[in-house]
Regions:
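Gly/Ser/Thr-rich loops at beta-strand to alpha-helix junctions
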Residues: 64-69, 75-76, 80, 103-107, ...
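Short, strongly hydrophobic alpha-helical membrane anchors
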Residues: 1-5
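Histidine-anchored nucleotide/phosphate-binding helix
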Residues: 48, 74-94
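Transmembrane-cytosolic junction motif
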Residues: 22-43
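Soluble extracytoplasmic domains of inner/organellar membrane proteins
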Residues: 134-175
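Hydrophobic core segments of alpha-helical transmembrane domains in multi-pass membrane transport
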Residues: 13-25
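Long, charge-dense
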Residues: 89-91, 95-143
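Membrane-cytosol interface motif
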Residues: 37-54, 58
Length: 176
């Protein structure tokens, strides 16, 4: 059952995890939730949305290349969670948002996330029909479409979150 030479590592991990869960359980019973530090990346999103609002220019957001049913779908769901956060900020500050999608199964989910964020922020009128755009499911065709969009719209913030391949460097350079 156990691999020779790994018994100590196994029991060490079990003891450390048990101690961690016990301390978290005890602290929540006392009414003190564990202290979590803020993520610098989320603070950067706040700054980027604020900068775009001040400049009066749009925010470009893309949740990456992975579809919803894939080994890499967790990265897409993380990108969509950050899309919700970014869309709420954009709706709150009335900053134009452009969301580009390259997977057909992600498109309706992204549309619903953005619409819900605008409704929650009380800015239903700020939502435009072309806020979420499906471009292409091919990596470099998508990149070319994003290049054109960046050149036309001149976004103040270019947020690429989720799973990315070779095109991410080109899009980031174009959007810089």
């Amino acid at each position: 059952m156990f691999i020779a030479g790994r018994v100590f590592s196994f029991w060490f991990i079990v003891i450390v995890m048990a101690a961690m869960f016990a301390s978290i359980y005890r602290s929540t019973k006392l009414g003190k939730p564990p202290k979590l530090r803020p993520l610098a990346q989320v603070n950067a999103i706040d700054e980027a949305v604020g900068r775009a609002t001040e400049m009066g220019r749009p925010i470009h957001f893309s949740p990456g290349f992975a579809p919803l049913i894939n080994l890499d779908s967790a990265q897409t769901f993380a990108g969509l969670a950050l899309l919700s956060y970014t869309a709420k900020l954009a709706a709150k500050f009335n900053a134009p948002l452009i969301v580009t999608i390259n997977q057909p199964d992600v498109f309706p989910l992204a549309e619903e996330i953005v619409a819900e964020a605008y409704v929650q922020a009380g800015n239903r009128e700020g939502l435009k029909a072309d806020t979420v755009r499906y471009l292409s499911d091919q990596q470099f065709s998508y990149s070319a479409a994003v290049f054109g969009l960046i050149m036309r719209e001149r976004p103040a913030a270019n947020l690429l979150l989720g799973r990315w391949d070779a095109a991410s460097l080109m899009i980031a350079e174009c959007g810089a």
